[in-house]
């Protein structure tokens, strides 16, 4: 480990627990040294209920009074796990070059991260991927960590749980065991994105037989943003529930900004290496080469990028299929490779060198996210020949990657109307061997710029129910501009709703716990518990307090929507109390004879005087 000259003042980020919450840790059994983080939400003492345990991806940032120093990075919790396997070696790594940061100099150059760690790679002939270990029958600490995390702290039930949902062929177990995690990874149905050079990340899994995950995109552009802003966006996104973060930076300082993000990220980080490679050739797509791209892959793998989006499915003879589209090729990576292919009139270097890319990924355990460069950018283009031709190629590439012990997920659309969404899921499962699907939405209509987090949230909930393993968020700024901090939160919350709705619909055994707890709090007028159990406690509280701001209103048996006389839940309480007093049968007879709820026909038809 080498130290670089520290910053005069390191940037600060959002810290502190969410309301009524505390971080708790569950130990491992196979690997007793692991500590799996979760969030406990305390309920009001009058509820008589235990705290509600929820999945937590926020890392140390939500620990009470945590000592966080961005210029030091997070604890390297997986380092010992990686080294104990005995199949890696440390080395000096490549030197940082001027082109790595877009030739930025002087005050325009983002400072280097103060700590340099020697990168690790596989020893010759070894594959250090979670897939290789799973196939060898090894239950890694990462796998046990994930099993505990997916169970949300639950113990195995003695009897089968009652299930309510339609899983469309998914096999979500009542209780996730480390062995189940191993089997799913070995079969290619799930991935654990965990680069050996990103030991700060807490292990998580992406697969349709697990909780639906969400990704948040961040990154600078040639126009705006800085290192401090991007690190804060990452912390902010994970605070609200992002399971992974993609750094899609396209401007200067890509290398240095990414280093700051990775060293401080408790979740896997993904990238599109093509973006940085393009910066290295001054933005001229035709000047891209395998040599430049290969160097970029190694650079990012050494830093600790956990998954690469690789647009290797854009083949030369597919490009003419996009000519008659309404919106052509909308993927940045797809359009870059299409331009390169047409200029050189040959298959892309990503396709021709795919096995070489696999060799790099298996040496660092970088997972593939096979990019959908020909995804539809409008509902008019959904499910067309170009889209599905590329998908079939991605299925072929998946088999090549699996043969090299590389982990793979498949990226999906895009813009798809509701009635065409399930066809996407069914076809992906069929042609890609059930590799995890990772979709951008899809957006279900094109008429709502400024509200595309909603148009896409609809599609995301549907395709998550049908089997998509991870949903890439869309913010209100989609198609309009670079999202800021508030947009990131809106996008994450929207997609947490979609993912959770999908888990409920699939019948995930732990999904309803939080819903039921909030519903009971709502019925019992426990306002503080309602706020604290929600995905966004601050917004829930603020909306309530806009009209009923006094502390006395936090125990009131009504809200400003109905007021005290028309609150349906208050009336339900009265009905329940009277029913318990007189007996249900007597109450039913009373109402049939013309009680408060049912009136005889002649009375109900009689108009009051004066009308």
Curated annotation (Swiss-Prot):
GO terms for cellular component: cytosol. InterPro entries: ThiC (IPR037509), ThiC-associated_dom (IPR025747), ThiC/Bza_core_dom (IPR038521), ThiC/BzaA/B (IPR002817). Its EC number is 4.1.99.17. Binds 1 [4Fe-4S] cluster per subunit. The cluster is coordinated with 3 cysteines and an exchangeable S-adenosyl-L-methionine. It holds the Pfam family ThiC-associated. It comes from the Bacteria. Keywords: 4Fe-4S, Iron, Iron-sulfur, Lyase, Metal-binding, Plasmid, S-adenosyl-L-methionine, Thiamine biosynthesis, Zinc. Its cofactor is [4Fe-4S] cluster. It catalyses: 5-amino-1-(5-phospho-beta-D-ribosyl)imidazole + S-adenosyl-L-methionine = 4-amino-2-methyl-5-(phosphooxymethyl)pyrimidine + CO + 5'-deoxyadenosine + formate + L-methionine + 3 H(+). Homodimer. PANTHER family: PHOSPHOMETHYLPYRIMIDINE SYNTHASE, CHLOROPLASTIC, THIAMINE BIOSYNTHESIS PROTEIN THIC. This is Phosphomethylpyrimidine synthase. It comes from Rhizobium meliloti (strain 1021). The lineage of its organism: Bacteria, Pseudomonadati, Pseudomonadota, Alphaproteobacteria, Hyphomicrobiales.
């Amino acid at each position: 480990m080498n130290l670089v000259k520290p910053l005069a003042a390191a940037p600060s980020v959002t810290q502190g627990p969410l309301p009524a919450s505390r971080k708790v840790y569950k130990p491992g059994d196979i690997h007793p040294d692991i500590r799996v983080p979760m969030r406990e939400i305390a309920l009001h003492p009058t509820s008589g209920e235990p705290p509600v345990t929820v999945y937590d991806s926020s890392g140390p940032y939500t620990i009470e009074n945590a000592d966080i120093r961005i210029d030091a990075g997070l604890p390297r919790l997986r380092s010992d796990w990686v080294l104990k396997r005995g199949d890696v070696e440390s080395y000096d790594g490549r030197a940082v070059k001027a082109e790595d940061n877009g030739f930025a100099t002087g005050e325009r150059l983002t400072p280097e991260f103060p700590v340099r760690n020697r990168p690790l790679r596989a020893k010759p002939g070894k594959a250090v991927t979670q897939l290789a270990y799973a196939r060898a029958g090894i239950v890694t600490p990462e796998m046990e960590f994930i099993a505990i995390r997916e169970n949300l702290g639950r113990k195995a039930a003695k009897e089968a749980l009652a299930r309510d949902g339609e899983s469309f062929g998914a096999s979500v177990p009542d209780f996730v065991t480390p062995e189940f995690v191993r089997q799913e990874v070995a079969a290619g149905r799930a991935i654990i994105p965990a680069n050996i050079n990103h030991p700060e990340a807490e292990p998580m899994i992406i697969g349709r037989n697990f909780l639906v995950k969400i990704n948040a995109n961040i990154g600078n552009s040639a126009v705006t943003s800085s290192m401090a802003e991007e690190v804060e966006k990452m912390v902010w996104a994970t605070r609200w529930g992002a399971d992974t973060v993609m750094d899609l930076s396209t401007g200067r300082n890509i290398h240095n900004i990414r280093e700051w993000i990775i060293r401080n990220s408790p979740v896997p980080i993904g990238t599109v290496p093509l973006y940085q490679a393009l910066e290295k050739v001054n933005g001229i797509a035709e000047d891209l080469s395998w040599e430049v791209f290969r160097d970029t892959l190694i650079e990012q793998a050494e830093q600790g990028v956990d998954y690469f989006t690789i647009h290797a499915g854009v083949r030369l003879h597919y490009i003419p299929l996009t000519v008659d589209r309404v919106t052509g090729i909308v993927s940045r990576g797809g359009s870059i490779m299409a331009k390169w292919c047409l200029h050189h009139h040959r298959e892309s270097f990503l396709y021709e060198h795919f096995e070489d890319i696999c060799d790099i990924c298996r040496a660092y355990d970088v997972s593939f996210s096979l990019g959908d460069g020909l995804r539809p950018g409008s509902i008019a283009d959904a499910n067309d020949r170009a889209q599905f031709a590329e998908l079939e190629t991605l299925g072929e590439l998946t088999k090549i990657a699996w043969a090299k012990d590389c982990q793979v997920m498949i990226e999906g659309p895009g813009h798809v109307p509701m009635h065409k969404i399930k066809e996407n899921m069914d076809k992906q499962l069929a042609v890609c061997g059930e590799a995890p699907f990772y979709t951008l939405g899809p957006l279900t209509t094109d008429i709502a710029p400024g509200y595309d987090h909603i148009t896409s949230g609809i599609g995301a909930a549907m395709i998550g129910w049908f089997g998509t393993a991870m949903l890439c968020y869309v913010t209100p700024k989609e198609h309009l501009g670079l999202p800021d901090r508030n947009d990131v939160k809106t996008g994450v919350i929207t997609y947490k709703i979609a993912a959770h709705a999908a888990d409920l619909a699939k019948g995930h055994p732990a999904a309803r716990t939080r819903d039921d707890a909030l519903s009971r709090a709502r019925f019992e007028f426990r306002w503080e518990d309602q706020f604290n159990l929600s995905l966004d406690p601050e917004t829930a509280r603020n909306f309530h307090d806009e009209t009923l701001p006094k502390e006395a209103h936090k125990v009131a048996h009504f809200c400003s929507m109905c007021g005290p006389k028309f609150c349906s839940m208050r009336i339900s309480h009265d009905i329940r109390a009277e029913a318990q007093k007189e007996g249900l049968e007597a109450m039913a007879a009373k109402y049939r004879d013309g009680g408060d709820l049912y009136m005889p026909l002649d009375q109900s038809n009689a108009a009051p005087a004066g009308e």
